[in-house]
Curated annotation (Swiss-Prot):
Family under the similarity heading: Belongs to the intermediate filament family.
Pfam families membership: Filament
Protein name per its UniProtKB record: Intermediate filament family orphan 2
Source organism (scientific name): Homo sapiens
Low complexity composition-biased segments: 485-497
Length: 517
């Protein structure tokens, strides 16, 4: 039926009636016009596809019918088992209701009271259960008097199977009845039945039910475990996603900071370009000043050498024997020296010799300062204090003053000498540091100058090559022009003139190169 309906729907979809009478329908014969053309490839493909689908549907229909048959059989057996269970349950309740004895007694049952079973069921009941049901019916008056048996008590019939009923007394005062010959049997899943009332099919069903319950519990436990794992994984995934979002936000902030710092760096470079230019200018000025100080240092060194030679050649004692009145006339402009001269007048005769030496040294230093005109405040280099040019008090060991010096005067003179030496050493250290810095700057400037000179020489060599090429081209042009006008003397003179010019230019460049190097 399903196949016919599907085939009818397919036929309607192709525009043909289910009978297939039209000539254009697939599978139908030609209409009243005679035999039509053969089926097209599309129609044949559709027909094959439809045939395969019909075959598949037939197979599914057969399987579905088998499944329905099995389902109906299982339903029938289930109804039968339910009916048997209801009968057994009702009989057990009836026995418990009417068989409550105070002592143990025997009961007779037999097949005489059995009736033929009903046509709808009852064939699966045991003989003892049927006999008990028939006996109960007779005792209650359910059987008619002419049914073939007398209404006697079922416990007094001969030829029956003996069973017993036991009454137990519990501790609480109650009474418990146990029915024989079977005993109570409790299923592991809590379903309580009696052994004598259970058929193998019911026992198998209980076993299957217990197995299904165990599998259900196992599946439930596994499902709960998987659910817990899934929840934990979901929590971890959410946490990782939040961490990834935070990392992305931090990365964006870092990129923004980097861009901002780059912009600030560009601005800072632009602002620092002017101070760098000023520093370069100051460095150049300092270099010029250093050159001037070097020249000044050479002059001062020469003057000091002359003074040392004069000291060695003449008597030092004559140089430093000066009257206090003469000192007042020569050094009246200096305030410090005038104060010292005033004090010298008040000194004793023993201190005159030491003061004369100190005043003479100061006078010589002032004379050198006035002669060469250098300042103490500026960074000019006075002279290089080494073993050859440094004037110390040790150089005046040959001086023999006329007045004997006392111990206190010698101590004062030594302190003055140490102070002067420390002052000159401090200034020398400062000058050496300044000289080192300036020499470093000069070395840098010289390296830059050498680089520029090399570049200039390369450009000069390129210019020389270009000049040679231009002169060659000029000669070629003049030669081609002179071919038309035959004047060999003029051509020779012009060639000699150009050759002389090139030679002079080469000589000038050769003179310039040694000077540059």
């Amino acid at each position: 039926m399903v196949n016919s309906l599907l085939f009818g729907e397919m036929a309607l979809a192709f525009g043909c009636p289910p009978g297939g009478g039209g000539g254009g329908c697939p599978g139908g014969g030609g209409g009243g016009g005679g035999a039509g053309p053969g089926p097209s490839p599309v129609t044949a493909a559709l027909r094959d596809d439809l045939g395969s689908n019909i075959h598949l549907l037939k197979g599914l229909n057969v399987r579905f019918r088998c499944f329905l048959a099995k389902v109906h059989e299982l339903e029938r057996r289930n109804r039968l088992l339910e009916k048997q269970l209801e009968q057994q349950q009702s009989e057990r309740e009836r026995r418990l209701r009417y068989k409550t004895f105070s002592r143990e007694q025997a009961v007779q049952t037999g097949p005489e009271l059995l009736r033929p079973p009903a046509p709808g069921g009852g064939h699966g009941l045991s003989s003892g259960a049927a006999a008990g049901a028939n006996a109960n019916a007779v005792a209650l008056g359910g059987l008619p008097p002419g049914g073939g048996s007398h209404p006697q008590h079922y416990g007094r019939l001969p030829g029956t199977i003996w069973s017993y009923t036991q009454v137990r007394r519990t501790g609480g005062g109650g009474v418990e009845t146990v029915q024989g010959p079977g005993v109570s049997w409790v299923h592991p899943d809590g379903v309580g039945v009696q052994i004598d009332t259970i058929t193998p099919e019911i026992r198998a069903l209980y076993n299957v039910l217990a197995k299904v319950k165990r599998e259900r519990d196992e599946y439930k436990r596994r499902w709960e475990e998987e659910l817990a794992k899934r929840m934990n994984l979901q929590t971890m995934v959410d946490t990782l996603q939040e961490a990834a979002q935070e990392a992305d936000a931090i990365q964006e902030e870092m990129n923004e900071k980097i861009e901002r710092l780059k912009a600030e760096l560009v601005v800072f470079k632009g602002l620092m370009s002017d101070p760098m230019t000023d520093l370069d200018t100051k460095i150049q000025e300092k270099a010029m000043k250093v050159d001037m100080d070097i020249c000044r240092r050479i002059d001062i060194t020469a003057k000091l050498c002359d003074v040392a030679q004069q000291r060695n050649s003449e008597d030092v004692s004559k140089i430093f024997q000066v009257v206090p009145k003469k000192k007042e006339r020569k050094v009246a402009s200096d305030d410090d020296i005038s104060e010292q001269d005033g004090e010298v007048n008040r000194f004793s005769d023993d201190e005159v010799g030491s003061m004369n030496i100190t005043d003479e040294m100061k006078r010589m230093f002032n004379q050198l300062r006035e002669t060469f005109d250098f300042d103490d405040d500026c960074d000019s280099l006075t002279w290089e204090e080494n073993e050859d040019t440094l004037l110390l008090w040790e150089d005046f060991t040959n001086c023999n003053p006329t007045i004997d010096l006392q111990g206190e005067q010698e101590e004062n003179l030594g302190n003055l000498i140490h102070e002067t030496e420390s002052f000159f050493k401090t200034r020398d250290k400062e000058y050496q540091e300044t000289i080192g810095q300036i020499e470093l700057e000069l070395a840098t400037a010289k390296s830059d100058m050498n680089r520029h000179l090399h570049e200039y020489m390369e450009m000069c060599s390129m210019k020389r090559g270009l000049d040679v090429q231009m002169e060659t081209c000029r000669r070629l042009i003049k030669g081609s022009a002179d071919r038309n006008s035959p004047s060999p003397s003029s051509v020779a003179s012009s060639d000699s003139g150009s050759t002389d010019e090139i030679q002079d230019e080469f000589e000038r460049e050769a003179d310039v190169e040694p000077m540059v190097s």
